């Protein structure tokens, strides 16, 4: 029987550190439920000590998820670990992931601690974490630049202290695959008690090698890979969950292990994360890109038509690609609507939320003849965003005519008050944004504006992503509507609502 390769997803923690990718508590729970359906082994839900928002998000995920282990990150200090333990109290299966830097430069310049003090602190942290859960993971931050002998000493000590998993991060994405594989093999050979622990890896993609390094580590004995959906993460991102899983699954002739991932949920997870974060997936992205299974060359097309395996090494349907399934229309009832949401893995928290979302569906069905699965995902995302609204779009009129200056008139609700403004602009979207700013005077800088059609057809909903920056903070906002100008206003206000509600948090470099 092959070894089990544990998939540790950190989309909700490390993935959220992408500039602009901040998620609300409800959004984190939605993604966590999709990861649970995918049968992800461990979900790192956040860094509870970073902020009250992070604490509550980890607590909510821990309460909602029963089929995956829920993990909270903590520095190797008692306050962080206590906070993580409290956030995870409601979890069916909980893990605390604690870390401390072990490289000479970090110990000297950042921690101002001697090597002996670092070992002592790491051991204390693991023992303290064991008071909250038997499942403790330890990471030596900046392992790639750490002295190998000292690294072995630290890891041996934390294993003796009760760590069940030791995670080796390539924090700055500098290591080559052969080097990283050799590092894992060396640690397993030199640490006397290495047989009592699972070796994990956490690779960053600064040189485009995160997946390659992770797979090299697996070939050298690592049995947990830390990764994110779509490779999301700060700088160039993390190892991509879908690429790691499908590389191991497709090359079972090569790898001595396999995951328990239900791969048909990969594409839905990719779309969900992309929609919530506002980070589109590049068309040529392996596994989940729109062109991943497209064949332009006539020779390739002919081969695929005759025998799929000529140019396809895996089946599109095995990762969740399927026909754009026609779903519902204006005559569809509430039960059919609820049933289709359940099939898509969308769970609404209450009957009240279901009723409100169904009414929005009926409004959309009046504008759009055919409703597809993608429309429902966008609809639910819009409704989830509405729950966090401080600023609410009440009405919008935009006018654009050839040879005339575009004009917009808008009404925004804020804590029960209504504010109105009008503005001209270089286009209807520009006029709308200017009108919003006349009311709110937010002082933000628009960094990104993008539009994507959710489905095909001239009556398709447009999904707009807006990225705003203010005082060094970056947020993304999304909006969907059959009217692009309305979708743009929704996206702009969505981003402003995130700026209004989100607090700054400390982001660890693990």
UniProtKB/Swiss-Prot annotation:
This is 2-isopropylmalate synthase. The gene is leuA. Gene3D superfamilies: 1.10.238.260, 3.30.160.270, Aldolase class I (3.20.20.70). Mn(2+) binds at residues 14, 202, 204, 238. GO terms for cellular component: cytosol. Residues 5-267 form the Pyruvate carboxyltransferase domain. NCBIfam families: leuA_bact, PRK00915.1-3, PRK00915.1-4. It comes from Nitrosospira multiformis (strain ATCC 25196 / NCIMB 11849 / C 71). Homodimer.
